[in-house]
């Protein structure tokens, strides 16, 4: 990881998609600042598509895609993509499991009952009622408990990951990166090779590691330094500030590089 301030001029000039984690990347200590919201608006005003890629529940994602300056939201660590209609207030929902979504949701409900009965200390997150494709457990303070919980979920055939709020579990061969590539290819006709120049991703925790490994332009929030030993893949760049402040640094750098390229192009005319 290198300080973002050291990025060479023009490096991000081809970025047309900003994908970003939400909790403690757009927010800081659970709050979204006006400046961060404004940064999302600045990206859209510059013609850059914005897609949060988050572990957050469907209920949160529905509100985000309807009211925030974003083009869509990938939620519950890749379980679905909610896409805002180009005109009006409509939202189209695309689930990884598609026709099997109801069955998968029931399977997760049964598993949650088993796990909380097996481990009395295991508690579901307050937002679990608003989830459609994942389980979210409050992070145990005891690392032994966390390991036991993950092992039981894996033995049941579920995938798991951790962010700064929850232990997330789901059924299916996907994660943030796999679903992001599917969305970019299916809805924006952007293949993996083209995405290396066109996509910028920002995040702050373990569940962002696949994105850090899968894309060239990646930014970690400054708080990531404290957990770098537990993250399988690190971002190319690190911000100076935490949460939304770090995200704004990335937005400023992208827009600066794009303005410089436009100025050079106009000067050559």
Cite the ranges covered by each PLM segment.
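N-terminal glycine-/serine-/threonine-rich phosphate-binding loop
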Residues: 4-48
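Mg2+-dependent phosphoryl-transfer enzymes with acidic/Ser/Thr/Gly-rich catalytic loops
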Residues: 8, 13, 33, 180-269
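Short, well-ordered beta-strand core segments
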Residues: 18, 43, 73, 218-220, ...
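Structural motif
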Residues: 27, 51-53, 202
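Active-site phosphate-binding/coordination module
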Residues: 31-127
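Short, structured coil segments at secondary-structure junctions
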Residues: 68-69, 77, 156, 214-215, ...
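Conserved acidic, metal-coordinating active-site core of Asp-based
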Residues: 111-214
């Amino acid at each position: 990881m290198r300080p973002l301030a050291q990025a060479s001029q023009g490096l991000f000039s081809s970025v047309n998609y900003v994908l970003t984690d939400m909790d403690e990347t757009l927010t800081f200590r659970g709050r979204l600042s006006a400046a961060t919201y404004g940064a999302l608006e600045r990206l859209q005003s510059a013609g850059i598509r914005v897609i949060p890629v988050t572990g957050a529940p469907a209920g949160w994602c529905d509100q985000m895609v309807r009211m925030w300056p974003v083009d869509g939201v990938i939620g519950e660590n890749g379980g679905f993509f909610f896409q805002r209609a180009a005109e009006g207030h409509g939202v189209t929902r695309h689930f990884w499991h598609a026709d099997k979504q109801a069955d998968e949701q029931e399977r997760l409900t049964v598993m949650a009952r088993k796990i909380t009965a097996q481990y009395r200390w295991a508690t579901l997150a307050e937002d679990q009622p608003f989830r459609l494709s994942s389980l979210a457990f409050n992070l145990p303070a005891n690392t032994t408990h966390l390991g036991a919980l993950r092992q039981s979920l894996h033995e049941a055939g579920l995938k798991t990951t951790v962010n700064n709020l929850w232990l997330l579990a789901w059924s299916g061969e996907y994660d943030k990166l796999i679903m992001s590539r599917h969305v970019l290819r299916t809805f924006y006709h952007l293949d993996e090779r083209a995405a290396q120049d066109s996509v910028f991703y920002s995040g702050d925790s373990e569940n962002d590691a696949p994105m850090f490994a899968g894309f060239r332009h990646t930014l970690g929030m400054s708080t990531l330094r404290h957990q770098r030993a537990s993250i399988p893949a690190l971002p190319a760049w690190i911000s100076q500030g935490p949460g939304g402040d770090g995200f704004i640094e990335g937005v400023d750098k992208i827009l600066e590089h794009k303005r410089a390229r436009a100025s050079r192009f106009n000067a050559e005319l």
